[in-house]
A protein has these predicted regions:
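Conserved NTPase motor "head" modules and their coupling/switch loops across ABC/AAA+ ATPases, GTPases
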Residues: 3-112, 121-125, 129-141, 148-155, ...
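Walker B catalytic acidic pair
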Residues: 116-118
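H-loop (His-switch) and adjacent beta-strand-loop-beta switch element
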Residues: 158-172
């Protein structure tokens, strides 16, 4: 189980590298697991049996590959400790684009890419570069709080391929 996960993680890291190269060769993002020892199948079964009552009570499984801890590195430094808000946002978006590409390659299906408040915390240069990267991704849904901000990044609301849905909140005093 961990071996399969390791192979998928390596494939995903390669996809992240490709996306980063398309975005900008100066940026590298790497994901590494911080789980010290990978148990054998027998170790896992033993721990599952040992924790079964706790798992049932908590309604979740406490052991397994889904509990591995990961560290995201941005320019070879742990993002959590050293990354600015813009670097966090940029890393998140690049990881989502890589995830989209990875799923597309693994399943031969083109998933919808959903990016919430895409341009927040990104300067115009980074925002435009991200938009250029996702432009050919297929169906993409981008939420944003400001239509002007979207236009500043090269998204034309009058393009028939784009659909802008403007939501208004009805304020009552």
């Amino acid at each position: 189980m961990w071996l399969e996960k390791k192979h998928l993680q390596q494939s995903f890291n390669r996809e992240v590298l490709l996306v980063c190269e398309k975005y900008n060769n100066d940026i590298n993002i790497n994901i590494s697991t911080t789980t010290p020892k990978k148990p054998t199948e027998n170790d896992l079964l033993e721990k599952l049996e040992l924790n079964i009552q706790k798992d049932v009570f908590l309604r979740r499984t406490l052991v397994g590959p889904h509990t591995d801890k990961y560290t995201v590195f941005f320019k070879d430094k742990p993002l959590r400790e050293y990354g600015s808000q813009g670097e966090h946002k940029l890393s998140f978006v690049l990881l989502k684009v890589a995830e989209h590409s990875f799923i597309k390659k693994e399943t031969n299906k083109n998933p919808t890419l959903l990016l919430d408040d895409l341009f927040a915390k990104l300067d115009n240069g980074r925002g435009n570069a991200i938009f250029d990267l996702i432009r050919k991704s297929g169906q993409t849904i981008i939420t944003n709080t400001d239509l002007v901000g979207v236009e500043a990044h090269g998204i034309n609301p009058n393009n028939p391929n784009n659909k802008i849905i403007h939501l208004l909140r009805n304020w009552k005093n």
